[in-house]
Amino acid sequence: MSIKSRIRTIPHYPHEGIMFRDITTLLKDPAGLRSTIDGIVQRYQTEKIDKVVGIESRGFIIAAPVAYALSAGFVPVRKQGKLPAETIGCDYQLEYGYDKVEIHVDAIDKGDRVLLIDDLIATGGTMEAAIKLVQEAGGEVIECCFVIDLPDIGGSRRLRQQGHRLFSLCSFED
């Protein structure tokens, strides 16, 4: 089954010149959703994964069922101020300015083997911040997983150059 063929492209959204990759068409298709989750689970089913970290917000949709299938815990990475208990945070650069993501201080145990999941990698800034949070909490990042890689934007290349393992189910090149 082609996951890529089930992803809708919306030109000039949210800004002129952007080709937005919309996974809602993949998620609404029962076979597409199953193929997405199963494809990720199959890759990691022989690994010992303690926690699956999902990045707000579309990463949650993929990460939670993967965590369930791998008998691992699920940890959300949220934007600043969205988690109710004590957090640790990491700033990351946007095109114009900065943003911050957080996890609860007790979300990752020292030595946890962690899989990070997001729907898409473009610049890699959010994933880089999530990696730093997991490491600061004492976790070991096993791999960063994405449904979509946009390699022309350079995020996957940058994270690989930093020594991180990455996996994506499909890629869209311009």
From Swiss-Prot:
Q: By its UniProt entry, which InterPro entries does this protein fall under?
A: Ade_phspho_trans, Adenine_PRTase, PRibTrfase_dom, PRTase-like
| Record localization | Cytoplasm
The molecular function GO annotations come to: adenine phosphoribosyltransferase activity
PROSITE patterns for the chain: PUR_PYR_PR_TRANSFER (PS00103)
The answer, when asked if Transferase is one of the entry's keywords, is yes
Could you tell me which pathway this protein works in?
A: Purine metabolism; AMP biosynthesis via salvage pathway; AMP from adenine: step 1/1
Concerning Pfam families, the annotation shows:
Pribosyltran
Q: Which SUPFAM superfamilies match?
A: PRTase-like
Enzyme Commission number: 2.4.2.7
Give the UniProt keywords, A-Z: Cytoplasm, Glycosyltransferase, Purine salvage, Transferase
UniProt keyword NAD, yes or no? no
Domain of life of the organism encoding this protein: Bacteria
Report which reactions are catalysed by this protein. Answer: AMP + diphosphate = 5-phospho-alpha-D-ribose 1-diphosphate + adenine
Q: Indicate the enzyme's highest-level EC class.
A: transferase
The Gene Ontology biological process annotation of the record reads: adenine salvage; AMP salvage; purine ribonucleoside salvage
Its biological purpose is as follows: Catalyzes a salvage reaction resulting in the formation of AMP, that is energically less costly than de novo synthesis.
Q: Which family is this protein grouped under?
A: Belongs to the purine/pyrimidine phosphoribosyltransferase family.
Describe, as the record does, how this protein assembles with itself and its partners: Homodimer.
What's the protein name? Answer: Adenine phosphoribosyltransferase
The organism encoding this protein is Nitrosomonas europaea (strain ATCC 19718 / CIP 103999 / KCTC 2705 / NBRC 14298)
